Amino acid sequence: VHTRRPLIIAAAVATAAFTLTGCVPNAGSGEAAALTVDSGADSCAVSADTAASGPITFTVTNSGDQVTEFYVLAENKLSIVGEVENIAPGASRDLTLVAQPGEYFTVCKPGMVGAGIGTTPFTVTGESVEANADDAEAEDAAVASYTAYVKSQAAELLPQVQEFVDAYVAGEDAEAKRLFPLARVSYERIEPTAEQFGDLDPSIDYRKPGAEAEGLPFTGFHRIEMDLWLDAAAENYPDEKIVALTPAERATLGEQLVTDITSLYDLVHSDDFTLSLSDITNGAIGLLDEIAAPDGKLPGEENEFAHTDLYDFTANVEGAQVAYEAVRDIAAAKGDEGAELTKTLDTQFAAMLELLATYGDYEGGFVDYSTVDQNARNELGAQLNALSEPLSQLTHTVLGVSAA
């Protein structure tokens, strides 16, 4: 995180009906296929793992003992194409969507926190379904889809940060170091949204120079990072006396991070939380700006002690891709310009993620970024530029205005 951004709260969200196309089906597209979902305490059973393209209604019954949610995810397991939430124990709710052919996943989230359970492949067969091009309806669907994604990532973030903080406070430094980059992934995917909330983001994710430049307490992820990698901190700041925090100081620092992440979760799940279409498009652009900034991931300054920048780099790209995909169909419908832009962005996002995958992955780990030489960083930068340049046109194409 580099600079403060103003609070942006706009437009409306949240419907129970989504489409996989981002558009609303024409009337007369046929009766909806009827599937049932049993969301239990430790299971998520869908009555079928395939359906024909067209309208589908999932009737979700909560047989567990916590309020639950049900999601239909895109093939990347990140983009949310449909979700129904706040299903009380014993209650049922319907999710109706229009399914285009493709591969998807279904998942339940008892307690509405964490990564969810029972993630299962779901295949839609048949021909593409015609959808109308009503701009307002398509925009509402895009905003609702991306808002659901933000909420989902915040829900995954909270237990990840708690696990990381627990290890850190317990003095389990090796485990805390392993968890540090993983605990940041969901945050980095939705960083522009987090930055909307005034002082919350600086408390969570400011680097040491940024906090000091603004006269703010140095807290959050990067303060813990500095304490875990003391040798690197001493090397980076040779004129300062860098000492290990006491157990009590660790506890206070960890508690503050969990409190801040809990506040973020509460804010994005509140009835007052809304996003606009421009929040989505400019957020996608902003995520790539975060990577390329002088104190960002590409130059290796974001995680200056841990050198785990490739985790953040990948998460920023993934978050930008999800934001782009939320508005992709709207952009593609904007004449030849939109069709060409989406074709280019599809190609460049795939190329960027393919290049990043040569350095590792979340499960097996990414290479230490300090071992990535300048030629390799230049290659990453060139591909980032090849993606960033067309992405910078997204707001103009979707809304007919320049990016903020």
Where are these regions (language model features)?
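Mature extracytoplasmic or organellar-lumen-exposed domains after removal of signal/transit peptides
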Residues: 128-404
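C-terminal motif of bacterial Sec signal peptides marking the signal peptidase cleavage site
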Residues: 19-22
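Beta-strand signatures of extracellular beta-sandwich domains
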Residues: 69-73
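Beta-strand cores of secreted/periplasmic/IMS beta-sandwich domains, seen most often
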Residues: 47-66, 93-107
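Bacterial signal peptide processing site
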Residues: 24-26
